[in-house]
Amino acid sequence: MAAAALRDQLTALLSSMFSQGLVDEQFQQLQMLQDEGGTPGFVSEVVTLFCDDADRIINEIATLLEQPVVNFDKVDAYVHQLKGSSASVGAQKVKFTCMQFRQFCQDKSRDGCLMALAVVRNDFYDLRNKFQTMLQLEQQIQAYDPKQQ
């Protein structure tokens, strides 16, 4: 009974992530790959790698924007990398924010980049918190029924 309640919570969480635009069909594809391939932990591994990578990239961008003379090409390269990582995991909102961020890089606008950094950081932290909750629910479900991924 408890596993069913946890599955309901997980379903509601995933549904809210889609409806809020945090994730898109690419994330759904990752889930399907896990289900069809019978590879438990695949989504967990991909999400964890994405979160670690995105956190590192955001910190690198912040460091670059603190410099007296900003290397906008370097900032843009990191934002492009974050956009690609976001797209591959289905992190739709972060991906769209990165697209806007890149425009500020091309305009060489420090203020615009700082504003975009705050937005992308907020979007990422929101998504990361949801991913962490999702992974915790999946672990709890698996503890009740080890045959489930």
From Swiss-Prot:
<dbReference type="GO" id="GO:0005829">
    <property type="term" value="C:cytosol"/>
</dbReference>
<keyword id="KW-0539">Nucleus</keyword>
<dbReference type="Pfam" id="PF01627">
    <property type="entry name" value="Hpt"/>
</dbReference>
<dbReference type="GO" id="GO:0005634">
    <property type="term" value="C:nucleus"/>
</dbReference>
<keyword id="KW-0716">Sensory transduction</keyword>
<dbReference type="GO" id="GO:0005737">
    <property type="term" value="C:cytoplasm"/>
</dbReference>
<comment type="function">
    <text>Functions as a two-component phosphorelay mediators between cytokinin sensor histidine kinases and response regulators (B-type ARRs). Plays an important role in propagating cytokinin signal transduction through the multistep His-to-Asp phosphorelay. Functions as a positive regulator of the cytokinin signaling pathway. May play a regulatory role in salt and drought tolerance during plant development.</text>
</comment>
<protein>
    <recommendedName>
        <fullName>Histidine-containing phosphotransfer protein 2</fullName>
    </recommendedName>
</protein>
<feature type="domain" description="HPt">
    <location>
        <begin position="39"/>
        <end position="144"/>
    </location>
</feature>
<dbReference type="GO" id="GO:0000160">
    <property type="term" value="P:phosphorelay signal transduction system"/>
</dbReference>
<dbReference type="GO" id="GO:0080038">
    <property type="term" value="P:positive regulation of cytokinin-activated signaling pathway"/>
</dbReference>
<dbReference type="InterPro" id="IPR045871">
    <property type="entry name" value="AHP1-5/YPD1"/>
</dbReference>
<keyword id="KW-0932">Cytokinin signaling pathway</keyword>
<dbReference type="InterPro" id="IPR008207">
    <property type="entry name" value="Sig_transdc_His_kin_Hpt_dom"/>
</dbReference>
<dbReference type="GO" id="GO:0043424">
    <property type="term" value="F:protein histidine kinase binding"/>
</dbReference>
<keyword id="KW-0963">Cytoplasm</keyword>
<dbReference type="InterPro" id="IPR036641">
    <property type="entry name" value="HPT_dom_sf"/>
</dbReference>
<feature type="modified residue" description="Phosphohistidine">
    <location>
        <position position="80"/>
    </location>
</feature>
<keyword id="KW-0902">Two-component regulatory system</keyword>
<dbReference type="GO" id="GO:0009736">
    <property type="term" value="P:cytokinin-activated signaling pathway"/>
</dbReference>
<keyword id="KW-0597">Phosphoprotein</keyword>
<dbReference type="GO" id="GO:0009927">
    <property type="term" value="F:histidine phosphotransfer kinase activity"/>
</dbReference>
